[in-house]
Amino acid sequence: MRNIKAAVEVNTVIIAETIAQVRAQVKEWKEQGLTVGLVPTMGYLHEGHASLVDKAVSMCDRVVASDFVNPTQFGPNEDLESYPRDFDRDCALLEEHGCSMVFHPSVEEMYAPDAATFVEILSDMPKQLCGKTRPIHFRGVCTVVSKLFNIVTPDKAFFGQKDAQQLAIIRRMVRDMSYGIEIVGCPIVREADGLAKSSRNTYLSEEERKAALVLSKAVFLGEKLVREGETDADKLVSAMKACIEAEKLAKIDYVSAVDAVTMESVHRIDRPVLVAMAVYIGKTRLIDNFLTEDCAK
């Protein structure tokens, strides 16, 4: 840890690279009676991540952000090696938004060479939506988030609604494992033209960037139909698919309506429903979603 005492005194973000350093600092904070918030990230931060930090700062005395590209949530032929990274830029953003500490471990720090323990939800929740084409993804997510919970021992943890399935799965894991942690979901942050903020947006060419607007266009269409009284989830999904299919650079992975808590498929909108999608724009896989209960707000 670099200049931890001075960093705390001048309100500069602390950089921790080991589990021991994080635990020592959090112990000091908790001995002072301070509350701790956690914002897990894979780095290459944008305004969506900044909004999570802002929310955490507003609710907690100290905020820890993790900056770790977690290899266990990437499958074969996914973008682990090419995933964008810019740690110095991340630190500047975190400091600007009042983050207290960034945890930036190596893979070796987080996973022993012979690590053989994973955290996995055995219901159908991780098998729906993104899990259909990314079968090991949520096992990796649950494992790394569980490890971060054990390392940081936060009072609250903050996750974005853009990864809605992940948020639901983390809530279930916290319930099932009796973690004494409040999970706070935060709204999707969008570009001025509607595209959901994502680190993977940097993969898009200029033409693909324009084509990617079809995701938010489909979301806004779905929200409009719900506000107008549509309760047939199948009709809603069909209309959104037709919207996306009109874009020649778009290839649908899925568009689905599911129970917002269990992730089970639904045919009628008679409860809180998550309408989610994953769409390839060229070679880049993007996600977006909305909650039907938010449409009346």
Predicted regions and their residues:
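Nucleotidyltransferase catalytic core that binds NTPs
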Residues: 2-249, 258-262, 290
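Phosphate/ribose-recognition catalytic cores of enzymes acting on nucleotide-derived substrates
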Residues: 239-297
